[in-house]
Every structure is written in C-alpha cells, then in structure tokens.
C-alpha cells in the first residue's frame, strides 16, 4: 500500500470554514424553521458588474466562431494585455508586465508558492491570520508538528497582532531567512498596515534575508489615501517581497476565479538565481493558465467603466461593514465589554469579547440570533476571544442581522 504523506498527519483537526458549515447544518437540522443569516465566510453576494458580464459574454460568443476561438496560451503567466493592464492600472508602472503572473486566484497561488519554497524554509505568520498560510505550510512540510500546548505549530513563528500593537506584529522574534506572511488589509482583523509599518517590514526582510509574501487581496477596499495599497509603494520591496492579489472580492470573482502575483526580477534566492525564473518553471509545469473567459472579465474590470462599477459594489460592502460596526455598539454589547475594531478600509469587523471563548460566542450568536459568524480562534492562538463579522451580504440581511444581534445575551 502507498503511504500517506506524513505532513498531512500534522494538520490540526478540521479546517475552520468546513467546521462552521457543519455547525450551521446541525443547528438548521434541529431548528428547521430558523432563518439563518451568514456574516461568516467571506464569499461575495452581489452580482458581477454589467460591464464585466458583457465582456465575458462577448468573449464566450466569439469562442463559437472560427475567428474568435483560442485555446490555452503558450505562456501560463497570462494574456499579455491583462498583465500590462495590471502593471499600469494597479501599480502605476512600479512593476513591469513581465513581473505579473496571472492565476486562478490568490489561494491557488499561495499553494503553489508554498510548494515552490518547500519544506526547508522557516515560516512566520501574523497571528491571527488566514488559515491557509499555516495549513499550506504544514502540507509543504515547513511547519513541523502541532505544538505541545495545542496552540500552533512548533516550527512556525507566530507574530501576535493585537489591539496593543495596532494589529501589526513585532518582527524581532522572526528568524533570519524566513518566509513572512503579511496580509493588508488584514483578514481577519481588517487592520491596514501603515507606510511606516511596511517600511519597517521591508527593512527587516532585506537585513535578515527574508522574503515577504504580501497578501493584498483586499487592497481595493482601502479608502484612506494615506495607507499603502501595495508593498511596492515602499522603496526596496522589490528585493524582498512577492505580492498576491485577487479579483475575487473587489470584482466578485469568487466563483469566476482570477488573480495574480507579482514576482519582481530583483528578487533572488540565496544562490543568486531569480525567484521569477523558478516561479515561471513552476507554473508552466503545474498550471496551464487562468481561464481565458475570466481574463476577459479581468480586462474589463480594470478599464475605466469596470473600475467605476466595481467601486460601487465595494462601497456597498463597506457600508455593510459600517452597519455591523453600528450594531456592535448597541447597549447589550457595551454592557458585555465588547469592543469592535474596524477602520473602514476592509470588509470585516473584528470584535473582542473579553472573558469569552470565541467558539462559545459563535454558538451563542447562532443559537440566540440565528446568525453565523467566524470564531477568532480559528485564525490562530491570538484570535481567541474575538469574532470576525463579514460584510459580504445583501443589505436587507445585514440590517436584519444587526437587529437580531441587539438581543444577544452573553
């Protein structure tokens, strides 16, 4: 018999979001008349922008003609026109088109990057953070076994991101030659790294031989012009950082699947070889390129009309976040000492429930309010006693959920 990959034995029991779905199903089964509203998983709910739909429709129709048909590209990095538009529109020329690698989404890029870097790399993650950073590292053999305390993995450096440090980590505990995972705007906290924060990060990475994997999937939600949307706004970042981006949340492509990562030409491994060359070999071997239909939609999303229409949807979600933040300021939450954190630049509201376990709060909100949330403990040890509320939802549902939450008793 073929042996199971030992790395998978080290995974913690259950991935966060399937566990949430399981508890929701069980509650629904025992309460069949309950109308459950989800403020949990970050899946978009609003329709694609009309301009994007028309572009994808036109492309699909062209595929039905001899003149318009095309198969996969010779280069798995994406259509040249889309790579150039990303470089021009998103990065204002800070990076070049050959440094853009179009993909089927940031999550997929994360998995391929983790495979490329392999088991012999040190890992540092924000705590709390998107679970894929840790779970993917475990699968790649870079995390070791679960710590004896049951909190985290032995070979991962957890960088606490708490209200006390403005949700940006102290880098002093990070070992040299580490992969440093940073997400801004952050999932789950919603915090955005400042220019000073990222300058410190870049300086640390360059000094200590680290590579930053910078997840900027929510950058389109930033409304404060003083906050950086890309790590490449910081001098020296091209020598130490890979940035991952996505059309999923800003353009509603969670089901369409389209994203990209930037691998600068200046970024090198210890032996002086270019990371971009290894990444090119990686994707040409293990990936055949993003869907041509999705790429047609991506081109439309980044022209003037597409940007205007997607901004309207982003604003809609940000307004939902404001409604959730308002609901968490009601008397019952104040009496319980609940503190919501949200700067208005992300589709999430992160709330502290002092003295309570986050899964207990999750269960209380589900049972009393019939609202699904996300327990902070699922994002890492420092997420305990926090709850993440997602603003991805229809307005009427968000408003109704807010009303129900005002009756929560803890």
Predicted regions and their residues:
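Helix C-cap/helix->beta junction micro-motif
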Residues: 31, 140, 207-208, 369
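Active-site PLP attachment segment
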Residues: 233-277
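Structural signature of PLP-dependent enzymes
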Residues: 273-290, 294, 301-326
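Conserved core of the PLP fold type I
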Residues: 61-62, 66-205, 219-238, 242
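N-terminal small-domain helix-loop-helix segment of the aminotransferase-like
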Residues: 2-105, 112, 301-307, 410
């Amino acid at each position: 018999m073929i042996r199971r990959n030992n790395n998978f034995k080290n995974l913690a029991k259950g991935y966060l979001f399937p566990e949430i779905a399981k508890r929701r199903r069980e509650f629904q089964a025992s309460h069949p008349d309950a109308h459950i509203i989800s403020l949990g998983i970050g899946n978009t709910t609003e329709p694609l922008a009309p301009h994007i739909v028309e572009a994808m429709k036109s492309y699909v129709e062209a595929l039905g003609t001899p003149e318009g048909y095309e198969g996969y590209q010779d280069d798995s990095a994406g259509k040249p026109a889309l790579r150039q538009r990303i470089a021009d529109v998103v990065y204002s020329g800070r990076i070049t088109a050959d440094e853009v690698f179009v993909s089927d989404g940031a999550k997929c890029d994360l998995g391929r990057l983790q495979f490329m870097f392999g088991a012999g790399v040190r890992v540092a993650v924000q705590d709390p953070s998107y679970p894929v950073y840790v779970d993917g590292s475990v699968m790649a053999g870079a995390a070791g076994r679960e710590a004896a305390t049951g909190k985290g993995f032995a070979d991962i450096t957890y960088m606490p991101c708490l209200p006390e440090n403005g949700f940006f980590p102290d880098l002093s505990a990070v070992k040299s030659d580490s992969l440093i995972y940073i997400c801004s705007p952050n999932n789950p906290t919603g915090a955005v790294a400042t220019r000073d924060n990222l300058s410190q990060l870049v300086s640390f990475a360059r000094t200590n031989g680290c590579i930053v994997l910078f997840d900027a999937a929510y950058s389109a939600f930033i409304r404060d012009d003083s906050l950086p949307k890309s790590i490449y706004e910081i001098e020296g970042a091209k020598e130490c950082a890979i940035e991952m981006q996505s059309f999923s949340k800003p353009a509603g492509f969670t089901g369409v699947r389209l994203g990209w990562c930037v691998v600068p030409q200046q970024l090198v491994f210890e032996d002086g070889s270019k990371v971009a060359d290894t990444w090119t070999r990686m994707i040409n071997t293990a990936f055949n390129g993003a869907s041509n239909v999705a790429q047609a939609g991506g081109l439309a999303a980044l022209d003037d009309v597409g940007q205007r229409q997607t901004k309207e949807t982003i604003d809609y979600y940000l307004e939902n976040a404001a409604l959730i933040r308002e609901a968490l300021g009601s008397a019952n939450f104040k009496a319980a000492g609940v503190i919501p954190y949200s700067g208005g630049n992300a589709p999430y509201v992160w709330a502290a429930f002092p003295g309570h376990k986050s899964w207990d709060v999750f269960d209380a909100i589900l049972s009393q309010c019939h609202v699904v949330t996300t327990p902070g403990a699922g994002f890492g040890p420092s997420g305990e006693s926090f709850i993440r509320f997602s603003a991805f939802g229809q307005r009427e549902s968000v408003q109704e959920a807010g009303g129900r939450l005002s009756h929560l008793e803890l």
